[in-house]
């Protein structure tokens, strides 16, 4: 079986810091701990309203990360310019609404093909690997291919939020089919959103999945067990699922 990689999203360390307007806990420190615990990359979402990760965080993390930065961002001129200046290894283009608590669904690539293709081409020309955060839908996967994106990240939120085991199994089948279809097109497949210690194994077991991006569950577990153990435990579950 191929390896599977873990990108640790540290947004909610910044959420905790910003709740009191303090300098702690510092997501830069969190990234260091996560890397030592086995994270293969660090994911951060610089939102337009800067509700958690800030420009300062992006700048310092770019200088200090020992693994790779995956910068999640909306498809706006401001964010594209920040990415071009920062030069992260990866950019994941995501939909964004100011009123949402977290990203609610996949990017409608098919409905905004020209705009997303232009952004993808601009970032790619700068040497940045582009991923598109989409639902496991053939139309969206085809559109991602048409944009020239080498990566997609399949939205696992519907799987994670399924009300029954039967519904969850249906969502897993959709993700598995989408991952297989994308891989056949030559696209590298990541996945994430809503994954926890209890539901991650079936997703991690899918052979086409290259990397999982997980944040909220890890930071939540870290409150009780410490961040190092929380990251290491998640990585262990993922690796075991691939055996």
Swiss-Prot record:
The record marks 153 as: Transition state stabilizer. The active site is at residues 45, 72, 193. It is found in: Cytoplasm. One of its GO terms (molecular function) is pyridoxine 5'-phosphate synthase activity. InterPro entries: Aldolase_TIM, PyrdxlP_synth_PdxJ, Pyridoxine-5'_phos_synth. SUPFAM superfamilies: Pyridoxine 5'-phosphate synthase. It catalyses: 3-amino-2-oxopropyl phosphate + 1-deoxy-D-xylulose 5-phosphate = pyridoxine 5'-phosphate + phosphate + 2 H2O + H(+). GO terms for cellular component: cytosol. Pathway: Cofactor biosynthesis; pyridoxine 5'-phosphate biosynthesis; pyridoxine 5'-phosphate from D-erythrose 4-phosphate: step 5/5. 3-amino-2-oxopropyl phosphate binds at residues 9, 20, 194, 215-216. One of its GO terms (biological process) is pyridoxine biosynthetic process. It holds the Pfam family PdxJ. Keywords: Cytoplasm, Pyridoxine biosynthesis, Transferase. 1-deoxy-D-xylulose 5-phosphate binds at residues 11-12, 47, 52, 102. Homooctamer; tetramer of dimers. Belongs to the PNP synthase family. Catalyzes the complicated ring closure reaction between the two acyclic compounds 1-deoxy-D-xylulose-5-phosphate (DXP) and 3-amino-2-oxopropyl phosphate (1-amino-acetone-3-phosphate or AAP) to form pyridoxine 5'-phosphate (PNP) and inorganic phosphate. This is Pyridoxine 5'-phosphate synthase. It comes from Vibrio vulnificus (strain YJ016).
């Amino acid at each position: 079986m191929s390896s599977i990689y873990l990108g640790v999203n540290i947004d909610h360390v910044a959420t905790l810091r910003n709740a009191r307007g303090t300098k702690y806990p510092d997501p830069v420190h969190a990234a260091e701990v996560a890397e030592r615990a086995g994270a293969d990359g660090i994911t951060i979402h610089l939102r337009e309203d800067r509700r958690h990760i800030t420009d300062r965080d992006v700048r310092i993390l770019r200088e200090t990360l020992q693994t790779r930065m995956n910068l999640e961002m909306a498809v706006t001129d401001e964010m594209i310019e920040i990415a071009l200046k920062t030069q992260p290894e990866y950019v994941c283009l995501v939909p964004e609404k100011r009123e949402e608590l977290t990203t609610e669904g996949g990017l409608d690539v098919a409905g905004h093909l020209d705009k997303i293709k232009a952004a993808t081409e601009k970032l790619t020309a700068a040497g940045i690997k582009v991923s598109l955060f989409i639902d496991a839908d053939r139309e969206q996967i085809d559109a991602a291919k048409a944009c020239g994106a080498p990566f997609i990240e399949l939205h696992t939120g519907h799987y994670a939020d399924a009300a029954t085991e039967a519904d969850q199994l249906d969502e897993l089948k959709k993700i598995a089919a989408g991952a297989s279809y994308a891989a056949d097109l030559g696209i590298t497949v990541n996945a994430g959103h809503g994954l926890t210690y209890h539901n991650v194994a079936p997703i991690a077991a899918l052979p086409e999945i290259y990397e999982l991006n997980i944040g909220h569950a890890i930071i939540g577990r870290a409150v009780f067990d410490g961040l190092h153990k929380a990251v290491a435990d998640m990585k262990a579950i993922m690796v075991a699922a691939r055996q």
